[in-house]
Structures are given as C-alpha cells and as structure tokens.
C-alpha cells in the first residue's frame, strides 16, 4: 500500500523514486516486520497466557524440558502477522507470484493453527490427525503447483537447475508438479520436526530465507541472472521483499523465543514458514539449492525416518537415543544452548555452500 502511494508521489517528489528499488524496500520490509514482532510480542505472550495456551512436554523426552510445560505457544501467529503487514506495505501487490507465496504460507499456517488449537485449547493430545494434516498440506501444495504448471509460459518455469553446473538443466515437463509438491510439503514438515528447542528452528529459517531472497533478486533481473548463470524468472522480484519480511519477523520472534523461551511458534509457525521456504524455492527454480541450504532440516528429517525404520526392522532397537537428532545430543549430555548454537553454525555452513553456487559453476 505504501509502495502504491510512493508511486503516485514520485512524479512530484523525486526523493520517492528510491522506493522503486527492491533493495531499499527489502530493508524497509525487514525493519517493519522486526518492529511489528518486537512491539506485538509482549501483547501476544500475555494474550496466550490469558488463554492458557501452553506447551505440552513429552514425558519420555529430556528431563530439562519439563520446565517448559505451560510456556505459551502458537506464537507463529505473530510471525505471520509481521510478514503479512510488511508485505502489504512494501510489496508491489500486482505481482501474482507474491500472492501465491503469501497464500501458500498463510494456508499452511491455518493447518498448523487448527492442529495447535485442537491440542492446546480443546486438550486433544493428538491434535489434527496426521492423515488430515497431510491431506490439507497436500491440497494446498497441489493447488499451488497446478497454478504454476498451467501458467508456465517459459521453458525455465518447468526446468530443474543443477547447482555448480552452468548449463545443466532438465526439463521436467509433467513431472514438475511432482517435484514441486514434494519440495513444498517436505520443507513444511522438515521445519516442523526441527522446531524442538528454544530458537533452534527460527534462526536457520531466517538464514535460509535471507539467502533465498538473494536468489529471488538475482533471478528476477535478466542481467544478473545471465552473469551468474542462474535461471531468469521474470516477475519474481517481490519475493525478495517477502524473504526479507521473514528475516525481520524471524528476528523479532527470536527476541522472545531465544533460550529460555518466553513463547514457542507452534505448528502454526513451523508449518507455514517451512512451506514458505519451499514455495519460494520452487518459484525461483532453486529446489536443489534449498536442499543444500536447508541441510539442517534435511538431517533432522532423515534422523526421524532412520529411527523409525531401524526400530521397526531391528525388533525394537534404536539408532539414536531419541529423534529428531537434536534430542539425541541432549540425551548425550549436551546443554540445550550448546545444541542450538552448534546447529546454527551448521546452518551457516550450509547456507554459505548454497550461496557459493551463484559463482561456482
């Protein structure tokens, strides 16, 4: 909305022309989301406490987690609010890719909200049954990828770009929706599995989102994309601002989610933000780069898959002390802050490797 206003004013006041630049609006979007998160955080925490919406803790988990019982959750609503407000203020709302990404994010947030509401308010320990959660995630993803597939007007829209190789691309054709579906749903659930310690998930989300914003910016510019050897995807520049909003909102949330956490994001936050990373990667054609930069989420997910599979086929034996992997290290004696910071460091390495693909081709 403010972007539209500056468009009207720039003819009379040349200073407003600065709002044409994606970089400037991205900075403003990030700061706006950060301020919304910081200012609304205490209000959200008090509101959640008043509703007695507190985290339930697994009795078979690390004993240090018992003190977390009752900590307000569903704080992901705050993150989504900050992102939405920031995007509405600073984005060019005529760009359809922005609306697609924003709607996929909010729709997955709604699925997570229903799950949290059933568990915490209705006191249904199972929340939204897994099959229904997966069903609605699938519906959202299929609608999104179908829209992208049927509106693909350029070969790049359905091509898979291989990192580190300048000219290696595969035209997925009818298999594009399949890949895109698994990226969106897989990313959503991977982030959800990672969100198990104070601040563990939100900082990697911030880092990956920031890096995806760089790819969105470069991909939307014909000159930059040609120089860097990445796909040129027109009309995706506003996703840079969307990713910047995630960065600001995530940092604002981390202020209250850092150890010891005053609030948790809940499924409403983790499912939404995971889906956001997935759909942005799909739109800017960087699915494999997301696999690299989101390596922590991949590792956490694989630890759960391996644990369940090994337990089933070994007659009850466990590969890890507990899954997801962060709980394994806690039970080995690592303090929670040490696990969190070390996993953040791992994410920094993965994100730098992903960004390196911009030049190493």
Swiss-Prot record:
Family matches, as Pfam families: Glycos_transf_4, MraY_sig1
Stated name of the protein: Phospho-N-acetylmuramoyl-pentapeptide-transferase
Compartments (UniProt record): Cell inner membrane
Annotated TM spans: 27-47, 70-90, 97-117, 134-154, 167-187, 199-219, 236-256, 263-283, 288-308, 338-358
Keyword rRNA processing: no
Sorted UniProt keywords: Cell cycle, Cell division, Cell inner membrane, Cell membrane, Cell shape, Cell wall biogenesis/degradation, Magnesium, Membrane, Metal-binding, Peptidoglycan synthesis, Transferase, Transmembrane, Transmembrane helix
GO cellular component: plasma membrane
Main location: membrane
Pathway: Cell wall biogenesis; peptidoglycan biosynthesis
Cross-referenced HAMAP family: MraY
Record-listed E.C. numbers: 2.7.8.13
Organism lineage: Bacteria, Pseudomonadati, Pseudomonadota, Gammaproteobacteria, Legionellales
Similarity comment text for this entry: Belongs to the glycosyltransferase 4 family. MraY subfamily.
Membrane protein topology class: Multi-pass membrane protein
Gene: mraY
Reaction equations catalysed: UDP-N-acetyl-alpha-D-muramoyl-L-alanyl-gamma-D-glutamyl-meso-2,6-diaminopimeloyl-D-alanyl-D-alanine + di-trans,octa-cis-undecaprenyl phosphate = di-trans,octa-cis-undecaprenyl diphospho-N-acetyl-alpha-D-muramoyl-L-alanyl-D-glutamyl-meso-2,6-diaminopimeloyl-D-alanyl-D-alanine + UMP
Gene Ontology BP terms: cell division; cell wall organization; peptidoglycan biosynthetic process; regulation of cell shape
Any one Gene Ontology molecular-function term assigned to this protein's record: phospho-N-acetylmuramoyl-pentapeptide-transferase activity
Required cofactor names: Mg(2+)
UniProt function note: Catalyzes the initial step of the lipid cycle reactions in the biosynthesis of the cell wall peptidoglycan: transfers peptidoglycan precursor phospho-MurNAc-pentapeptide from UDP-MurNAc-pentapeptide onto the lipid carrier undecaprenyl phosphate, yielding undecaprenyl-pyrophosphoryl-MurNAc-pentapeptide, known as lipid I.
Species this protein is from: Legionella pneumophila subsp. pneumophila (strain Philadelphia 1 / ATCC 33152 / DSM 7513)
Top-level taxon of the source organism: Bacteria
């Amino acid at each position: 909305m403010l972007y539209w206003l500056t468009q009207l004013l720039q003819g009379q006041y040349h200073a407003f022309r600065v709002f044409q630049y994606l970089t400037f609006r991205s900075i403003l979007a990030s700061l706006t989301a950060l301020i919304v998160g910081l200012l609304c955080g205490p209000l959200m925490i008090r509101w959640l406490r008043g509703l007695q919406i507190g985290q339930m803790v697994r009795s078979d988990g690390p004993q240090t987690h018992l003190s977390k019982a009752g900590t307000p959750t569903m704080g992901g609503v705050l993150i989504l609010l900050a992102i939405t407000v920031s995007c509405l203020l600073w984005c060019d709302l005529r760009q359809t890719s922005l609306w697609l990404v924003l709607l996929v994010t909010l729709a997955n947030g709604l699925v997570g909200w229903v799950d949290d509401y059933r568990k915490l308010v209705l006191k249904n320990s199972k929340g939204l049954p897994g099959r229904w959660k997966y069903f609605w995630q699938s519906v959202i993803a299929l609608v999104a990828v179908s829209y992208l597939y049927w509106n693909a007007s350029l070969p790049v829209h359905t091509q898979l770009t291989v990192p580190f190789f300048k000219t290696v691309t595969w035209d997925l054709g009818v298999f594009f929706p399949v890949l895109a579906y698994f990226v969106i749903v897989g990313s959503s659930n991977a982030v959800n599995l990672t969100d198990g310690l104070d601040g563990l998930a939100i900082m990697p989300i911030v880092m990956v989102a920031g890096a995806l914003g760089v790819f969105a910016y470069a991909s939307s510019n014909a000159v930059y994309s040609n120089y860097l050897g990445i796909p040129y995807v027109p009309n995706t520049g506003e996703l840079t601002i969307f990713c910047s909003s995630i960065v600001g909102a995530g940092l604002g949330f981390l202020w209250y989610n850092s150890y010891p956490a005053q609030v948790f994001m809940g499924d409403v936050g983790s499912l939404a933000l995971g889906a956001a990373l997935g759909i942005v990667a799909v739109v800017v054609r960087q699915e494999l780069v997301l696999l690299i930069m989101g390596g922590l989420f991949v590792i956490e997910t694989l630890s759960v898959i391996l644990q369940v599979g090994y337990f089933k086929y070994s007659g009850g034996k466990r590969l890890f002390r507990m899954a997801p992997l962060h709980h394994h290290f806690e039970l080995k004696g690592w303090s929670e802050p040490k696990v969190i910071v070390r996993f953040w460091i791992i994410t920094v390495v993965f994100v730098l490797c992903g960004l390196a693909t911009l030049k190493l081709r």
